[in-house]
A protein has these predicted regions:
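GST superfamily/GST-like fold recognition
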Residues: 122-126, 155
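Glycine-rich phosphate-binding loop signature in dinucleotide/nucleotide-binding domains
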Residues: 15-18, 104-114
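Generic beta-sheet signal
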Residues: 113-122
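Active-site-proximal alpha-helix that buttresses catalytic centers in soluble enzyme cores
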Residues: 1-37, 41
Length: 171
C-alpha cells in the first residue's frame, strides 16, 4: 500500500508521458506500477525477460542485510565470476537485458509504435542503458528512484548502425 501511495503522489506531482503501449516486467509490482502510471494505455504487454536478475539464495532479502554478507559482496564485484546458488550469472543477466531492449525496439519499429513506456526494475534499467544508451555511463550512473526512469529515443540511422538509444530526459 505504501508503494502504491508513493506512485499516486508521483503521478500527481509529475507529468508522465501519455503512451498507448506499455511493456512491463511480469512481476506483480511492475504490472501494478504500469497500471497506476499509465492507466489509459491501450496495449500493455508483460515481457518475461524484463524481470529482475535472479538472486538465488539472496532472493527476497533486504539489500541492507545482503551488503553485510561476503558471498553477496563477491557476487556484485565486477569480474569476480562468483555466482551464488540458484542465482542468474551476471553475464547472462546483462546479455538478456541488452537482447530484450533490442527486441522491444524491433517490435516498435515493426508495429510502427513511436512512443511506449517500459516498466521494469532498477537493475534491468541500469543494465540496458549502460550497454545501449548514449551518453555512455556505468550501470550505477543510470540508477533511478522507484516510479522514475528515463526518456530515450533513437532514429533509424543510430539504431541500424549502432543499436543505440539516446537518453534525453529523466521521468
Amino acid at each position: 500500500d505504501e508503494g502504491r501511495a508513493q506512485l499516486k503522489e508521483l503521478k500527481e506531482r509529475f507529468e508522465y508521458p501519455q503512451v498507448d503501449t506499455v511493456f512491463s516486467s511480469p512481476l506483480v509490482r511492475a504490472v501494478e506500477t504500469a497500471n497506476i502510471l499509465f492507466p489509459n494505455a491501450g496495449h500493455q504487454f508483460t515481457v518475461h525477460d524484463l524481470r529482475e536478475a535472479g538472486f538465488g539464495v539472496f532472493e527476497n532479502r533486504p539489500v541492507k542485510d545482503l551488503v553485510k554478507e561476503e558471498d553477496f559482496k563477491k557476487w556484485i564485484t565486477p569480474g569476480s565470476g562468483f555466482v551464488p546458488e540458484g542465482a542468474e550469472p551476471t553475464e547472462q543477466f546483462h546479455a538478456r537485458c541488452a537482447e530484450t531492449l533490442l527486441k522491444l525496439f524491433e517490435y516498435m519499429i515493426r508495429m510502427d509504435v513511436t512512443e511506449a513506456a517500459c516498466v521494469t526494475h532498477g537493475g534491468v534499467i541500469m543494465s540496458m542503458l549502460s550497454q545501449r544508451a548514449l551518453p555512455s555511463r556505468h550501470p550505477e550512473q543510470w540508477m533511478a528512484d522507484p516510479g522514475c526512469g528515463y526518456t530515450v529515443q533513437t532514429d533509424v540511422q543510430l539504431w541500424m548502425r549502432d543499436r543505440l538509444v539516446e537518453a534525453i530526459d529523466i521521468v
